[in-house]
Structure formats: structure tokens, C-alpha cells
Amino acid sequence: MFDVESLLKKLNVSEDKKENILQKEQLKKNLETLYTNFDTDNKLLFTLACTAPKKIDILIFGILINENVIKNDATLRASMKFAIKNTDVTYEELKDFILKNTKSKEEVSEIINKACLSGKSKKEVYIILKNKLPFEDSKYLMDEVNKFEIDTSKSKKVKDWLEEGEVSMLHKPGDNPQLNEKILKDHLERTGGKVVTRFPPEPNGILHIGHAKAINLDFGYAEKYNGICYLRFDDTNPRNEEDYYFESIIEDVKWLGFEPYAITSSSKYFGDMCELAEKLILKDKAYICELSNEELKKRRRMLSEAFETDKDKSIEELGLILSPYRNREISENLKIFREMVEKKHKEGDYTLRFKMDIRSKNPMMFDLVGMRIIDCDHVVTKDKYNLYPSYEFALCVSDSLEDVTHSFCTREFFTRQESYKWLLDALEIYKPVQWEFSRLNISNTVLSKRKIVPLKKYGIELDDPRLYTIKGMRRRGIPPQAINNFVKSLGITYAETIIDNKKFESFIRDELNKTTQRVMCVMDPLKIYIRNAKEQEISIPNSNQKIIFKPYIYIEKSDFKMEDDDKDFLRFTPNQSVGLYMFGAIKFIKFDNDMIIAELTNETPKKFIHWVSCDSIKVTIRLYDPLFRSFNPEEGNYLDNINLDSLKTVVGYCDDRIKGCEVEDKFQFQRVGYFCVDPDTTPENIVFNRIITLI
């Protein structure tokens, strides 16, 4: 009989993980399926068992791992994505997909060498390689990059945003004051004096450009000082959390080019938080309250308004009671709390509240809720708990348990500093320092999940290229390095402003100009027959590529004018020749059934234009404009401000250089703009998204 525990022991799985695995029936089934059929020493099978979506046939993947076709985590992730998109995929189809996308050692070496000699920084090179070699192991790529002495003298210098302003003068590890010397000494022994940061998203939505600023700060600060950064999920509200959001956030962070030291979650510490809550009760720093949420909010509001009116009076003088349960006996509090932990009460019966210093008159010190019952299973802990810590409890304790030295958060958390410090001192545990920075607000869009979700009724999903979600920007074709450079260019400030999206666009163009291949594409075709021309091969300058010229071509309708009434129009007219890029000049002969008859000429043209042969590749092109008409859609009802013409779809014709393109490949369509291959692409129809215009 299959013994899961023996297998986990053999694989050296930690006790925490083992306990979590043993609660998951599907995961145990996966392990049994794989390890009774294949080599029990292969740890990649364990990764497959833990990460496989229900939709895929894990036996097919197990066979491919066993045959060494799937060799690493990166190939496994990419092939699982393929299987999800292509339901009922066969062994042969999946194997063919992997082999087609797996580069030879020589090809990988060539791509790495070229990237490392590009003049970009190591981080930029790593991002390029991750995108070009998605089937290669991340650690291998980073090791290869680190072997190179990379010369960045060719690259555009970006100022070090962490060496300007207050962020450059933050405390060093060990300089942040603690309740006593022992706490500080123990902390430094655990960390070795390293900088420790964390990025703590809630897994209830997807990341956007504002998060990219926080990610760059959290990971960048740790990297600058040779420290570590955790990716920690703040998963304290099981009703709003989904597996998809956990996976999506990890994918987005890595796509931006950052590797967490470890991926953790507040739920990892739920047991510790129950013990710490008992400690607070025993110290008379917490109590069990029976007030409803509505009554609790009402009393907090009344107290806040009373302090505003009579600033010098105490709560006793005001005659207000925050909670009639505030002075409940410690033994009674402890008894009820233990019953809550044991699931003997239902949602709404009780909450654990901190017994804080109300004299501070800061609303964030009005006995915040520390733990509450939510009758809902958790994505990670399943049905182990129904008592969950509040955000205020979980963030502080998780920061402390992970020995975070610099706890970065946006400025609206400034009022929470006092409660943050109070709680950790009350618990007599290590206390990180919080430091606030301004949110990133960008023009012509909305960023919050609360405002993005209602856009669904307009057909706008979370990954819509018009949104500034990480998924949306990636789908549109915006390079991760452009996002990183943009947010770093803004610096770290406390003042909140709305940044014009045109500033962001300049970073996008700068990056795409350096990295995209130029091709020709005609989107509003006018047919021309060049009657004295012959089919021929044309070599592309500075490239080993060639395209075929044929006498029947398309040009843009806007490049031809029948009237000669505009002296500033220097392109094609009945009396003015025009140059065809990489070919030669043509002159107008006549119109024939909506087609121009032309001839090659030796005249020197005033302008050259792009063109394609009439049998070029037909493609679908999506032209995106800002989703909202106004600079700040937040003013008034943002839904009334939607630009209903922000997406136009046209048919275009591209030259043969796009053959073999893959999803997320990017091109510059000469004289038109930058475009990216969309996931809606099929073998029969390539779909392009316009990333941005040339100017």
C-alpha cells in the first residue's frame, strides 16, 4: 500500500509542508499516481504533484519527466500552461510542443552570449533571457549571466533611485530601537545583520503598475544592501482569496525580473498568532468582545467625533464606552478564546480585540479587532481554522517573525504606525521599522480592483491591454524593464500626484526601440501593379534575412494622393514619384479598377514608404487607445468617462519576417508603431496588439 508519509520523509519535506500536504486529498492522489509509476528519486515529480491543475493528465507529464523531455521547473510550468489552453492534449502533441520550444545547447549559448554583450545590466539581461528562453532553468540562466563581466557603458544610465531623498538615509539593521536589548540581540543573531524586506500582497486580485513600484522598492532595497526579500501573501480573508491569485502574483513578480528569497504567507503563522493572542489576553492587553461589526464601527465613529469636538477631554469625561466587554475577567476571556480556537462558536458571536491606549486619540488605537471567526475554508489551511487574524494583527506579527528590518508601505498606513508598534511591544517581540511612500497614480486609468471589476460589463477583463494591470501590460507587449525603469524614475516620495501616462510611454518606446525587430506591415491597403518589375529576393540591411518582392504590392492609402494641391505632401501622387523601402522608386501611370498601375523609375524620390507584396501574411491588428477620456477618471463617475472607441480592430498585411512568431513576440511595424503577438493567435490567424505608436 502506498505510504505518503514515508515518501515525504524520503524527499526531505519539512514538517510544515508535510502537515499541509496530508490535508490535501487531491495532492495525495497525485503523489500516489506519480510515485507508484515512476522513479521515486525524481523531485520534479513532486513539483508536478504539488502544482498540477485538475484539468491536466498528470500521467502524460510523468512519462515526459521520466523520459527526461521535461527537465526542469521552467519547462514543466510552460508545458502545463500549454495543456490548460489545449484541453485533451495527447502525449505526442505535448512532447512535440516541448521539443519544438527547447533550444539546443548551442542556441542557448548563442542567445546568452548575445544578451550578455548587449551593454545591458545583469538584471536586464536576466529578464531578456527569461523571456527568450522560458524552457530554461532560472538558476542556470542566472549562473550563466553571473559568469560574464557585463559592460554597461553602452546602456542608458538610470539614476539610482535608492540613493536620493529619505530612502537613502534609512536606519541600518540593528539601529531600530527595541523594547529591550535581548530582543535586538536575538534578532541580529537570526539575521546576521542582513537587510530583510517583504512584498505582502493580498491574494484577492491581480497586480497593477502601482504594485510594480512597491515590488521594485521591496526587492531593490534588499538587493542594494545584499539582503533578502520575501514574497508574503497576506491571506487573512478566506472569502476573497483564490488559488488563481496566488499563482498570478508569483508569475507577475517573476516576470518583472525578481526572485523572492522565499514565498510565505500569513497563514503559515496562524498557529503562532493564536498563541500570541493568548499571551495578550494573559497580559490584559486583549479581550473578547460580543459587539456586532455595525455597533463596533458606530462606537468607534462616535468616539472619534467626540475627540474631534473636545480634544482635551478623556473618554471617561466624554461619557463614552468603547465596549461593555472591555473589562471582562482574564479567565473568562481565555476560556471563550480557547473555545473560539476549537470552533465551538460561529461567525459573529465573538471577536478578539486589542485593549489599546485610547488616550492617544488615534482611531487606529480604538481597540482594533485582532481575530474574528469566518465560517469559510482557507485556500492554504483548508478547514483547519475558522478563527482568522485581522490584517492589523497578521501584518505586524508576520513582519516580526520574518525579522523584517524595513517594512515599506504606502502612505495611507501612516496612522497605523502607532498601533503597529503598540502590538509588537505588547507582545515583547522584535519590532521592524515602518516607512511610508506615496502610491503611484497614473493618468487616464483606474487601478483598484474595486473599480476594475465593474468594467467586465463592457467586455474588459483583468488582462485587457488597455488596463495597467501587470497581466494587461504584459499582454499589450510592454516590456518588464520599461515598467521597472519608469517606476524607478519617479523616485520615492511622500507627496501624491498623478503621473501623465505619456511619461511612461517614453520608457516603453526607449526599451522597444532597443529590442524589437523591424518589419513592414500595411494596415489600410492600396494595391499597385509595377508593370516593369520582376519578382526578386531583397536582402535586409544589417541582417541575414531576406524578403520576396513581387510586382503586385500594397502600400498605405494615406501614402497616395490623387490631387497635387498640398506642397507639403512628399509621398506618392500622379505627378510625384515615391521610393519603396529597400527597393527603388516608382512613378504613377494610371488607375485601373481601383488599382494603380506604376513603373520603376530612376527619379530621385523625396520620400520612401513601406510596402508589402500582395500575397503577404494577413493578420488581425488591435489598435488600443487610453480607456478613459479624462486625465483623472476618478473625478466624478469614472464609468461615464469610458472611451468607447478605445479599441479598433483592422486587418493588415505583414512581410514574411513575422513567420514563426510566438505569443509575446514584439515587432516594430516601420513608420507605424510597436506591436505584440496576442494570446488569441491561432495557426490560421496571427493577432497583434498595438503596444504604442512611434511618437
Swiss-Prot record:
Ligand binding (L-glutamine): D234, Y391
UniProt cross-references to InterPro entries, sorted A to Z: aa-tRNA-synth_I_CS, Gln-tRNA-synth, Gln/Glu-tRNA_Ligase, Glu/Gln-tRNA-synth, Glu/Gln-tRNA-synth_Ib_cat-dom, Glu/Gln-tRNA-synth_Ib_codon-bd, Rbsml_bL25/Gln-tRNA_synth_N, Ribosomal_bL25/Gln-tRNA_synth
A GO term from the CC aspect: cytosol
UniProt motif ('HIGH' region) ranges: 201-211
EC number: 6.1.1.18
Major enzyme class: ligase
Highest taxon above the source species: Eukaryota
Motif ('KMSKS' region): 446-450
Keywords associated with the record: Aminoacyl-tRNA synthetase, ATP-binding, Ligase, Nucleotide-binding, Protein biosynthesis
Catalyzed reactions: tRNA(Gln) + L-glutamine + ATP = L-glutaminyl-tRNA(Gln) + AMP + diphosphate
Family: Belongs to the class-I aminoacyl-tRNA synthetase family.
NCBIfam families, per database record: glnS
Protein name, per record: Probable glutamine--tRNA ligase
